[in-house]
Swiss-Prot record:
Belongs to the bacterial histone-like protein family. The keyword Transcription regulation applies. This is Integration host factor subunit alpha. GO terms for molecular function: DNA binding; structural constituent of chromatin. This protein is one of the two subunits of integration host factor, a specific DNA-binding protein that functions in genetic recombination as well as in transcriptional and translational control. It comes from the Bacteria. GO terms for biological process: DNA recombination; positive regulation of metabolic process; regulation of DNA-templated transcription; regulation of translation. Heterodimer of an alpha and a beta chain. The keyword Cytoplasm does not apply.
Length: 98
């Protein structure tokens, strides 16, 4: 099962009694703050959860898996998430669906 933004918003409404529009705005703004910080080159540290950062990936040769044709993969920035210790401990013994 996947937790979506809609389900996250519904959880805020049921657990804390938020108005639907307030809960939706809160969730959207939370993720927007993370996006803006990363776009500005800042690392995002959420205590007890983990860190989001950007990593530069160099250009490299690649291959189209369908045709086998060689293609150039351009340099880019990718988002990296490193879970914090408390987060890792909480999910350590969670059973994963196979």
């Amino acid at each position: 099962m996947t937790l979506t933004k809609v389900e996250f918003t519904a959880s805020l409404i049921s657990k804390y009694g938020f108005d639907k529009s307030v809960a939706k705005q809160f969730v959207e703004q939370f993720f927007e703050e993370i996006r803006v910080a990363l776009a500005n080159g800042q690392e995002v540290k959420l205590s007890g959860f983990g860190n989001f950062s950007l990593r530069k990936k160099n250009a490299r040769p690649g291959r189209n898996p369908k045709t086998g044709e060689s293609v150039a993969v351009s340099a880019r920035r990718v988002v990296v998430f490193k879970p914090g210790q408390k987060f890792r401990e909480r999910v350590e013994n969670v059973k994963v669906k196979s």
